[in-house]
C-alpha cells in the first residue's frame, strides 16, 4: 500500500502579512502531491489555532475535499475500534484520510476540536487512542493513533493505552509529542524517548517537531515529517527542506517529497564595537537576496558581540529591503543578566509553542507554588479563565463548587 504522511501544516499561521498565504499554499501543494496514494495520514497541527479563523477553515475544507474527488484505489476498511460516524463513510468511498489532533488543536475534555469537526463533515477519520485497519489486494495496514496530550502525561497515557501490533499487518503508530532526543518545547521535558516507545511496529510517525527526520529503531522505521511551513525561524529550518513522506508498505521504502516552500536564510554575525555594524549587516543581506526567487526570501540575522546598533537602524533596514526580502533580527546581548531574562521568552517565540500551552504551564507553575491540591483539573480551570468565566474558576479553586457549570 502507498501512504502519504503530512504533518504540521499550521493553517492560518501568519507572523507578518506577507507570509499569510504560505501555510495554505504549502499544504495545498503537499496534499495535491499526495493524491496518488492509497491513504493519506495527517500527523497533527493541521491548524495553527484551537479556534481557527474563517480563512483557515475555508482553505482546509477546499484542500481536504480534493480527496473526496479521487476514486478509491481498492482500499477497504477491515476494522475500527470506535463508532464510525455516518459522514466518515464518505472518505472511505474515495481516498481515505486519517488524522490526529496536535497541541495547537487541543481543547478541553468534552469540547469538539477542529479535527473532530472535519470528521463530522466526512472529510477524514479522527483517531485518539484508536486503531483502524485497512486492506488492499490481501495486504493489511493497521494504524494506531494517539492525539497530542500534555507532555507530562504522554508516557502514562501511552502505557495505559498499550497499543500492540497486529499479526499479518503493516503496523503504524501515529503520535504528536516531544520524543527525546527530538525535543521541541522549552516548557516541559518529554516523558517519551526513543527507548521507551512501544516495540514491534513497522513504522512510528511523530508530528510536532518541525524538522524532518528519518531513523531506524531496531527493525522499526521512525519518521518525523516536519512542518510544511516555516514557523520557528531557527537555523535548523534553514538547513532542511519542507515536505512530507511517502511510504510503500510492501517494499518498506520511504521517500521524502520536497515542496516549493519559501526560501529561508539564517545567519549569525558577530560584530565588535569597533566595526561598522550597519554596513556589515547590510552586506550580508545583499549577499543572501542575490538571485531569482519565486517568493521573497525570509532572512533572519542573529547579531552577537558588543557592537552598538539601535532598534531604529534595524527598522530602517527592514524598510529599505522590504521589496526584496522579509527581514527578522535578533540580538544576543553581552549583558549576562539581560540575556538570561530574554532567553526564555526568545525560546518560546522561536519554538512556536501554542499560546494555550504557554498559559497552561504558567498556570500549573503558579498553582504548584501556592500548594493547591489536585482536587480539580487545572486544564479546565485554564479554559474557564480563557472563556472569561472567572467567578466559576475562583469558586472551584476555593472548593465552593465542584462542577464546571456556572453557579447561579
Feature locations, PLM:
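Extreme N-terminal starter segment of soluble prokaryotic enzymes
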Residues: 1-4
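Divalent metal-dependent phosphoesterase catalytic cores across multiple superfamilies
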Residues: 22-35, 64
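Short N-terminal binding/cap micro-motifs at the start of the first secondary-structure element
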Residues: 12-15, 153, 310
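Active-site metal-binding motif and surrounding structural segment of the metallo-beta-lactamase
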Residues: 32-45
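Acidic/histidine-rich helix-loop elements
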Residues: 11-24
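His/Asp/Glu-rich metal-coordinating catalytic cores
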Residues: 22, 39, 48-245
Amino acid at each position: 500500500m502507498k501512504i502519504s504522511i503530512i504533518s504540521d501544516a499550521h493553517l492560518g499561521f501568519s507572523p507578518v502579512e506577507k507570509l499569510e498565504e504560505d501555510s495554505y499554499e504549502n499544504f495545498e501543494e503537499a496534499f495535491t502531491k499526495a493524491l496518488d496514494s492509497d491513504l493519506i495520514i495527517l500527523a497533527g497541527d493541521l491548524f495553527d489555532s484551537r479556534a481557527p479563523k474563517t480563512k483557515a477553515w475555508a482553505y482546509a475544507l477546499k484542500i481536504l475535499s480534493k480527496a473526496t474527488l479521487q476514486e478509491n484505489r481498492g482500499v477497504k476498511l477491515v476494522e475500527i475500534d470506535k463508532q464510525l460516524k455516518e459522514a466518515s463513510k464518505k472518505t472511505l468511498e474515495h481516498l481515505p484520510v486519517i488524522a490526529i489532533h496536535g497541541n495547537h488543536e487541543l481543547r478541553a475534555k468534552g469540547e469538539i476540536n477542529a479535527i473532530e469537526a472535519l470528521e463530522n463533515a466526512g472529510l477524514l477519520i479522527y483517531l485518539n487512542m484508536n486503531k483502524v485497519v485497512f486492506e488492499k489486494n490481501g495486504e493489511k495496514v493497521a494504524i494506531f493513533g494517539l492525539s497530542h496530550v500534555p507532555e507530562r502525561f504522554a508516557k502514562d497515557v501511552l502505557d495505559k493505552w498499550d497499543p500492540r501490533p497486529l499479526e499479518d499487518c503493516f503496523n503504524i503508530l501515529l503520535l504528536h509529542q516531544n520524543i527525546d532526543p527530538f525535543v521541541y518545547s522549552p516548557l516541559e521535558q518529554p516523558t517519551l524517548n526513543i527507548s521507551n516507545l512501544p516495540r514491534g511496529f513497522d513504522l512510528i510517525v511523530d508530528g510536532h517537531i518541525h524538522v524532518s527526520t528519518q531513523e531506524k529503531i531496531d527493525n522499526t522505521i521512525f519518521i518525523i515529517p516536519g512542518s510544511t511551513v516555516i514557523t520557528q525561524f531557527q537555523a535548523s529550518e534553514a538547513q532542511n527542506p519542507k515536505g512530507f513522506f511517502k511510504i510503500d508498505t510492501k517494499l518498506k521504502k520511504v521517500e521524502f517529497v520536497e515542496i516549493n516552500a519559501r526560501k529561508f536564510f539564517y545567519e549569525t554575525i558577530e560584530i565588535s564595537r569597533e566595526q561598522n555594524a550597519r554596513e556589515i549587516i547590510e552586506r550580508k543581506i545583499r549577499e543572501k537576496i542575490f538571485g531569482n526567487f519565486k517568493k521573497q526570501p525570509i532572512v533572519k540575522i542573529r547579531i552577537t558581540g558588543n557592537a552598538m546598533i539601535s532598534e531604529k537602524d534595524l527598522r530602517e533596514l527592514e524598510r529599505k529591503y522590504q521589496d526584496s526580502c522579509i527581514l527578522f533580527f535578533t540580538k544576543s546581548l553581552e549583558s549576562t543578566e539581560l540575556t538570561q531574562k530574554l532567553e526564555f521568552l526568545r525560546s518560546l517565540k522561536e519554538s512556536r509553542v501554542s499560546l494555550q500551552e504557554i498559559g497552561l504551564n504558567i498556570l500549573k507553575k503558579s498553582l504548584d507554588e501556592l500548594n493547591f491540591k489536585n482536587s480539580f483539573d487545572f486544564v479546565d480551570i485554564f479554559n474557564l479563565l480563557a472563556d472569561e468565566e472567572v467567578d466559576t474558576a475562583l469558586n472551584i479553586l476555593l472548593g465552593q463548587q465542584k462542577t464546571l457549570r456556572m453557579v447561579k
